[in-house]
Amino acid sequence: MNSINSTETLELITKANNLSLKKGYDEISLERAVFLSWWCDKGDCKFCYMSTQKNKIKDPTKAKRRVNNILAEAEMCSRLGWNIEFLSGGYKSFTTQEIKSIAENIHSITGDGVWLNTGITSELKEYGTEIKGITGAVEAANPEFQKIVCPSKPLDQISDMLDTAGDLGFKKAITIILGLGESFEDVEYLKDYIREHKIDRVIFYSLNPHPETEYVNSSQPASLYYAKVVSTIRLEFPDLEIICGTWTDNLANIGILILSGANGITKFPLFKMFGTKYGKRVEEEVKWTGRTLKGTFTDKSKLGPEKSEVNPELDQYIKRYIKDSLKNKYK
């Protein structure tokens, strides 16, 4: 991009907002990725926290979360009105049957099918109605650049998996990270990918520069750049579900991303932010877009009892999540 036209960007955002309102996108969801493990057998994506952990984890089984802890988190999300963005885990952290069992239990807790983001797999036929959709961690839609940032996740294999998912009746999603060094012109690759593979949902994230990665000294993408990408995609794909992630140090992005076409927002530490000034800020950002918020970051009554309402084996984890939510973590 040789020159930046701020007027053009603002016009795109305005058009995207008008389109969103016309489509009835007046409710914004709070989304939470539920992690299964901190181990990834690939462990070489240039930006990823897990890439810094692979050589430190001597026993990968110890990096797996307890299943009851995962299920308790899902129950708390349900109580607070949060959507589960997807189940996420590094390669070879859980078997397909283990993931299926976890998803079945979450489905029974929330009453909703689960999205998966658990890597490239040829075993999609093992899943059933407990799964709503399959997410491909594309990260960068420019094929040549994607090879650099995710060398062990071939884009053609992700694409084949998503096409198979569609054939099996699952919805299809992809994740895209902005701020990796891509150009705005790469949005054309993204358009082509969404169109070619009939993608139902795109989840955008801004780069989080993790220590010990190549991006440690990189900045997060500019808010208007992020907004321009999102508004461009919204205008091109009116029916696409768009989720946008931002970090606690960039909460001011929320409002402009919603106006740019986001249906939901993600990437928040739920139990750390709940009831704090940061949780309130999220709700205020949504309020000033004229949308309503599905779920809460502040209503303590929604936390519910300190015992599980579905399985007593989850009690200790429910109690801990509620206790963590009631602490003021940002004094």
PLM features: residue spans?
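Active-site-proximal loop/turn and secondary-structure-junction residues that shape catalytic pockets
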Residues: 34-36, 91-93, 118-122, 140-142, ...
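Catalytic cores of alpha/beta
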Residues: 121-130, 180-195, 249-261
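N-terminal pre-triad scaffold of radical SAM enzymes
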Residues: 12-55, 62-69, 75-79, 83-86
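Conserved C-terminal portion of the radical SAM core fold
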Residues: 84-87, 133, 156-215, 227-243
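Auxiliary Fe-S-binding modules of radical SAM enzymes
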Residues: 1-4, 195-331
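Active-site phosphate/pyrophosphate- and oxyanion-stabilizing loops and adjacent acidic/basic residues
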Residues: 17, 104, 231
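N-terminal small/glycine-rich loop or linker at the start of catalytic domains
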Residues: 29-60, 145, 163, 167-174, ...
